[in-house]
């Protein structure tokens, strides 16, 4: 299997217009959406396309999507700690919020923006691999300004073995962290169509030469 932490593999697995159920399942699991919050439909702002190698220096292979409520979601995989990811996540989230309206338009039309960052390095103190960040009232601890939400998953802090994966989110994190070291789909992942599709998309024998070239380029670039 391809390494989902590789930018092009991540975008192919989670940003494919033809397999939206993968991204929907992942988002619902990460954000713990249930009931009326559950995402049932998404529209990809920047669906998967194989980028040209010569353009990759200027290309950010994130995933941008809106749900049935027109809320915005940004998902980004970051392999290396460049020291600016926190600031960058704030910038992209703010930009997605501002870009919803032209100047002078009705601010009530602004929709919530979620940022999900998957990190192959340690960014925050603490033991948990998942941290959620909101704007809270310091005195009452209430979330009165609720149009921004950030979720960071630090893959290096996730250490559960296959036998201890108890939630769908556990399985998604395990898949992203460990898929490239597996030779077959574990039995713990069978029976879930989104997870099975994710493994199918990661099967490199299904990839064309152009995708393989970009994957290899991104793999080498990660070691620069």
Regions found by a protein language model. Name each.
Residues 145, 152-186:
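Compact structured core domains
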Residues 13, 17, 30, 156, ...:
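Generic structural signal for hydrophobic core residues of well-folded globular domains
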Residues 7-8, 20-25, 87, 110-113, ...:
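Non-catalytic, well-ordered alpha-helical scaffold segments
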Residues 73-78, 170, 174-224:
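Short, charged alpha-helical interaction segments and adjacent helix-coil junctions
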Residues 130-136, 166-172, 218-220:
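Short intrinsically disordered coil segments
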Residues 1-151, 159-161:
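Accessory alpha/beta interaction modules
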């Amino acid at each position: 299997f391809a390494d989902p932490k590789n930018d092009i593999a991540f975008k192919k697995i989670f940003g494919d217009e033809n397999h939206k159920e993968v991204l929907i399942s992942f988002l619902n699991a990460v954000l713990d959406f249930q009931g009326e919050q559950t995402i049932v439909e998404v529209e990809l702002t920047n669906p998967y396309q194989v980028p040209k190698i010569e353009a990759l220096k200027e290309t950010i292979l994130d995933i941008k999507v809106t749900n049935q409520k027109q809320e915005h979601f940004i998902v980004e995989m970051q392999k290396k700690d460049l020291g600016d990811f926190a600031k960058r996540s704030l910038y992209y989230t703010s930009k997605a919020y501002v870009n919803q309206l032209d100047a002078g338009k009705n601010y009530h039309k602004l929709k919530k923006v979620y940022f999900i960052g998957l990190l192959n390095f340690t960014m925050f103190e603490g033991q948990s691999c998942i941290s959620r960040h909101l704007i809270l009232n310091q005195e009452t601890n209430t979330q009165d300004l609720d149009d921004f939400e950030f979720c960071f998953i630090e893959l290096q802090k996730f250490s559960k073995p296959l036998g201890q994966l108890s939630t769908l989110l556990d399985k998604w994190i395990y898949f992203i962290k460990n898929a490239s070291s597996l030779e077959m789909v574990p039995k713990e992942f069978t029976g879930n169509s989104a997870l099975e599709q994710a493994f199918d998309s990661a099967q490199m024998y299904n990839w064309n030469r152009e995708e393989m070239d970009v994957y290899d380029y991104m793999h080498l670039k990660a070691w620069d």
